[in-house]
Structure formats: C-alpha cells, structure tokens
A protein has these predicted regions:
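His/Met- and acidic-residue-enriched segments that coordinate or traffic transition-metal cofactors
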Residues: 2-18, 22-179
Length: 179
C-alpha cells in the first residue's frame, strides 16, 4: 500500500502544465495583432514610405534642381525615421510589414528612374512630392481618427504633422520646378 505522503496528487501533477499554458495564452494576448483595418494601414504606410525613400534616393542622383535635392534629403531623413518607428510598432504588435513599395509604386519608380534633370524634377515634384503626400496625409488622417489600436492611432497622430509639412513643402517645390 502506498503511504499518504507518496500518493500521486493529480492536481499538482497537472497544475504546472496548465499554468504554463495559461501564461503562454496571456503572453500571446499581449502581442495580439491589431484589428485588420489597422494592419492594412500599417502595410500601406510601410509601402508608401518605402516608395518615398526609393524615389528620394533617385532624386539625390537624378535631380537637376537644388530645391528638389534638398526636399529629397529631408524626405530621406524623415521617412527613414518614420519607417523605423513603424517597424518598432509592428514588431511589438507581431505584424510583418512589407519591405518594398506596392506594384503600382514600383512602376512609378521605374518610370521616374528613366528621367534626368528638369524632366525628373517635374515628375518627382508632382508624383512623389504632391500626389504621394496628398495620399499619405489622407491615409494618416483616417488612421488618426479611426484606428482601433491605441498605439497604431498614436503613431498616425504623431506622424501626420510631418506629412502635412511635407505636402506644403512639396507644393512650393512643384511651383518652383514648373517655372
């Protein structure tokens, strides 16, 4: 007969694995992906930012205007910083971001890369400066108001004023290069 002290205790035997499972589930909950609309915003923001970085890299070599080169330099600095912030946010939320521009933006970059000097300047100012920033401002405004994840919403709110400033800078640059 088994003594009382040596009897197996089913509750203790199952408690450790059950506790481990509960902790694992709780930890996964801390890193749960944001709602699908917020993830879609993050993906679009990553792709748009990557397009602006790649286009601005092109501008450093192909632009003829000093204004375009200065604008592109500012875009590289600001969009790299925003991309790093977005990457940290995505990592914390367990979201895998795209690392390349969208297919449409890749086509625009290819067309832009075929240009030089004044023709490059006009196209860059129009497509990357004004049009892309109009789209980015709209995207970030919507996320600032509608994102359900508070961290995603805060990222959009924090980044929006910079994008609005870029849009104003782009309009000025576009008027300079269209003269």
């Amino acid at each position: 007969m088994i003594s009382e002290a040596r009897k197996p205790r089913p509750i203790k035997r199952h408690a450790a694995p059950a506790l481990a499972a509960m902790l694992l589930i709780a930890a996964q909950g801390l890193h749960a992906a944001p709602p699908s609309g917020d993830v879609e915003f993050m993906n679009k923001a990553a792709q748009a930012g990557q397009m602006e970085i790649e286009a601005s890299n092109l501008a450093q070599n192909k632009a003829g205007s000093g204004a375009v080169k200065r604008f592109a330099g500012q875009m590289l600095q600001d969009h790299r910083a925003a991309a790093a912030d977005l990457k940290r946010l995505a990592s914390a939320k367990g979201v895998q971001l795209p690392t390349t521009p969208s297919q449409d933006d890749k086509k625009k970059l290819e067309a832009l890369g075929a240009l030089n000097g004044a023709s490059f300047d006009k196209q860059y100012a129009s497509e990357v400066g004004v049009k892309a920033h109009n789209e980015a401002v709209a995207l970030f405004r919507k996320a600032s108001a509608e994102a359900r994840d508070t961290d995603v919403r805060e990222f959009a709110r924090k980044t929006l004023p910079t994008l609005e400033h870029h849009l104003e800078m782009a309009k000025t640059m576009a008027s300079e290069v269209s003269r």
